[in-house]
């Protein structure tokens, strides 16, 4: 498996720039470095209207987009376990693994493109429900807070568990404190 070079991470906290720098190799002699070249694309979005190269902004409840927003302003239902994504992943599994008949042109196209990749589904996901959770889950490669930095280990099978449990582990319950959540693009050290 190839190690991923560019990563998106979440930084949780009002002083997001300081937190992001805290774990960056761009600080000379930083022994707590996990990445380098950390950038938030918010300024680019505001000035040019362009989104980042490796990350998508949060959809906000007011209809706008942002790379940095208060937890309660983000429309989490659009990006985590979205019913449309859940249904699409369910149908993909049924078409490819269960060999269901396509109901429309989009499904015929999907089945034709994915049928030779049936092993992707069966080798990586124990059940349809696990695939649906994985496909529709919001996740990032790392999370930085004032207290610590955690990231997924892309070299082992824990990536599936990381993706499925990301929201519950790092974001669930933050509505009470309503912290600033910021997306950063980073470059791995290796």
Protein language model annotation of sequence segments:
Residues 178-190:
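C-terminal or internal capping secondary-structure element at the end of a domain, subdomain, or sheet
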